[in-house]
Amino acid sequence: MSSTRIELDQDFIDQVKHEIKPHWGELGWVTYKRTYARWLPEKNRSENWDETVKRVIEGNVNLDPRLQGTPSEEVINELTNEAKQLFRLTYGLSATPSGRNLWISGTDYQKRTGDSLNNCWFIAIRPQEYGDSHIVPTYIDKREKAVSMPFSFLFDQLMKGGGVGFSVVNSNIKQIPKVDNKIDLTVVINKSSKSHDASIKVGAVDKDEWEKQNPDHDDIIYYRLPDTREGWVLANARLIDMHFNNTNPDQKTKLVLDISDIRPYGAKIHGFGGTASGPMPLVEMFIDINNVINARVGKNLTAVDATDICNLIGKTVVAGNVRRSAELALGSNDDQDFIKMKQDKEKLYHHRWASNNSVAINSKFNNYGPIADGILHNGEPGIVNLDLSRNYGRIVDGYQPGIDDDVEGTNPCGEISLANGEPCNLFEVFPYTAEKQGWNLKEAFTLATRFAKRVTFSHYDWEVSRKIIQKNRRIGVSMSGIQDWLLNDLGHRVVTGFEDAVDEQSGEKIKKPIYDPKGIEMVDSLYKAVITADKAYSEELGVNPSIKHTTVKPSGTVAKLAGVSEGMHFHYAGYLIQRIRFQASDPLLPALKECGYHTEPDIYTKNTICVEFPLRAAHADSKNFASAGTVSIEEQFATQAFLQTYWSDNAVSCTITFQSDENDEIAPLLRQYRHTIKSTSLLPYYGGSLKQAPKEPINKKTYEERAALITDDVEEVFTKQNDDQKGLELVGQTDCEGGACPIK
């Protein structure tokens, strides 16, 4: 069916560029240019900000299903005007779509790959049907449950640049049948492949030599991998499924995987972008996964085994230099092997680093001592309260049994509770910036709601996702720079104090937070605006209202664009040095040096340059300003509870930082907020004690001295140097406060 296309004309864009100055943070333009500006081959340069915003907004507005066929003049005018407002909102940096949308929306890759606009996903690790999906193994019926399916889903989404949360709780793992077969795996490669020698070193064998020794293939399953994402996934699926009789119809136990056609290291990846890792990481992954499952022949896989398989997949995906896989493993709270699995340092450094690990709890759970102890040792596990997620939206709206009953887990950063196969779908508004730029906040949040709703009309690759998205239409409208906004509008932080109280169930004495009533009204009114907008738009489109609507995402890279505090987090310090790592060949480096930024070789990675940016937080000199280094653990818990109570009906992503003298408060505070906080994680506050730390707190005098050395605007100098070329790629840059989500 043909469709009408909404486009923004150049005269309008030129007018907006004349009227609105983007609210770049001190790191904003540099972060944008190296992370979200796509290469324009026809112009031999990367995008400028107005071109990125045009691409992104048009890519989104044209998802409105009413544009299929012959839409009315009224619909065309409505969406054209909406596109213009969204352009103004985003160009000025009063709000932005998720980083994933900034990178992918409006590209050919979006049109080809329906999943590409969603940052993160969730899958339950249990046998599942492939169904009507873009990947279905040929050796089984699409309606047959296969152990490989959730691993295939995870592998596919990670390679498309998404993060994946996965559940290995006991109720899922016990559905996996006993391992029937030990598989004899051989990975072969042709001498003509450029990757031949490197692949042999990691365990592959020469194809000609193997053929000589194995002239008879009757008892062998032979699979020659095509040079595609799907080929990698299907090879791994075959390897996993051969271990189980019900998905091994040939009852063969020898598997040969031929990797001769896989492009070599450094070759270009079309679509998502970047360069290939070559087949070597894949060879290692196949061998390692086979060893994990072979070790359980006659027994059941454990939660640790399943997590290892997911981590090995994640490690392989990370080997490509663009995709940064984020994983969250959710285990049972009484599974001590799972909770302690990262204490095996050899396996931690080999692959177990690839996921952040959390445990599933309910509000009756009370054994927080071991969890607090684990957090003190290695910052894990985080906690996810599935009971609250299934039966509550905002806490203030009370118990609503089964309101979100399909929830089984969360995305890697923990701000969206998700059902099996479901993605998060994010857009964030910067209320502090939006107010400064004259926006009515309710209008800004209405535009955000409609943007996110349209993403649910993408063509999704997996049947499990299509079904749950059509049912739930879940969106995640977030706000960032929350501390800046509250401090600006209230004149102080939202937690004004604590009062003595008693926990009604346990009888323990607690300190109950006191919130500024105006702060409550501020977020409550915006929540109601989102609900109203979703209801109206859903009626227009003839679809279900979204099951949940609001969240607080950790932000990070996107918050840097506007220079605001990240999500609900407090600024790391009032004044700080932010260090960002660039590849030594990055064309931004000469401009940064000419502007006076301090640069030096990175002490951890070859061919990498560390650049220091002096930053000042909004309101850094206010007597009511607090940073992550000065705010108490109690106030951070209370602030997260405030947002979960009055703003977010999904969840609130938060990494609470604590000082060494607050260690004993972790377990009591987790217990106190068990009826309020849906997910949280904690990390010790380091305060820049590491050499070349990403963030190093400094005093005002040092900031002023460093800032005085910066003589020019990087964007202007870069343009003058006219050295705009490819290669603007992040090195070791994590997106959110806890480092869980480096997803673009």
From Swiss-Prot:
One of its GO terms (molecular function) is ribonucleoside-triphosphate reductase (thioredoxin) activity. It catalyses: a 2'-deoxyribonucleoside 5'-triphosphate + [thioredoxin]-disulfide + H2O = a ribonucleoside 5'-triphosphate + [thioredoxin]-dithiol. Residues 169-318 are annotated as: Effector region-2. The active site is at residues 413, 415. Its cofactor is adenosylcob(III)alamin. Residues 148-159 are annotated as: Effector region-1. Pfam families: RNR-II_ins_dom, RNR_Alpha. The keyword Disulfide bond applies. Residues 690-729 are annotated as: Adenosylcobalamin-binding-2. Allosterically regulated by ATP and dNTP. Disulfide bonds join 120-424. Keywords: Allosteric enzyme, Cobalamin, Cobalt, Disulfide bond, DNA replication, Oxidoreductase, Redox-active center. Its EC number is 1.17.4.2. It is an enzyme of class 1 (oxidoreductase). GO terms for biological process: DNA replication. Monomer. Belongs to the class II ribonucleoside-triphosphate reductase family. This is Adenosylcobalamin-dependent ribonucleoside-triphosphate reductase.
